[in-house]
Amino acid sequence: NRRLPEQQVVNGTPEFWSIGYLTDVILTRDPWMHRLDLARAIGRGPVLTADHDGVIVADVVNEWARRHRRPYRLELTGPAGGTWGSGTGGEQIAMDAADFCRVVSGRPGPDQGKPSGLLATQVPF
């Protein structure tokens, strides 16, 4: 799989992305996040489903967990939510699934403040 010529910096670490990662992952997540942004801008909540949005959220959670590599328990609420975890004794997080994705994308809402702990681990969108 060919890689892009320039490095991307994620969580302070430079990394190379493959063209496949860009087309299969980023070009799915980015428009999805814009959908959430537009819904927020017009004051309407997005209509999320487990079948579509839940798959994107699960993909984000799995990459987030691979990036931080620490024990955790995550409970995401809403139609796109679910429960994930790895290891024991780790941080426990409970929040809305769409808010989780906003936070780990580096675009928390004004009421969410600066992320800390495992939520400071960003995932590319």
Explain the meaning of each model-derived region:
Residues 1-125:
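Structured surface interface patches that mediate subunit assembly and partner/cofactor docking
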